Amino acid sequence: MLVLLVAVLVTAVYAFVHAALQRPDAYTAADKLTKPVWLVILGAAVALASILYPVLGVLGMAMSACASGVYLVDVRPKLLEIQGKSR
């Protein structure tokens, strides 16, 4: 369980850092939620996987994995495509 928690936490932190480094106008150009909204969602995902894990347990870890997964699978490729960067 600890290995899974660390994997979800690393994924959430990676998604948060990636979202923070992108241009704000790329989110609207890709027709996705705005940058501040994604930073709040992914910040909450990091909190769920780290600070709030003792309170929410596996439910918090699952919500964190879902939020990070949606960003990495749906939003990130569109942002890279809009900005002309490779994957």
Swiss-Prot record:
Q: Which UniProt keywords apply?
A: Membrane, Signal, Transmembrane, Transmembrane helix
- Native source organism of the sequence: Mycobacterium bovis (strain ATCC BAA-935 / AF2122/97)
InterPro entries from the UniProt entry: DUF2516 (IPR019662)
Mainly resides where?
Answer: membrane
Q: Which Pfam family, any one, appears in the UniProt record?
A: DUF2516
List the protein's name: Uncharacterized protein Mb0486
Q: What is the lineage of its organism?
A: Bacteria, Bacillati, Actinomycetota, Actinomycetes, Mycobacteriales
Where does the record place it?
Answer: Membrane
Q: How does it sit in the membrane?
A: Single-pass membrane protein
Give disulfide pairs as residue numbers.
Answer: none
Family the entry assigns:
To M.leprae ML2453.
Which Gene Ontology cellular component annotation is one that this UniProt entry carries? Answer: membrane
Chain ranges passing through the membrane: 39-59
Q: Where is the signal peptide?
A: 1-19
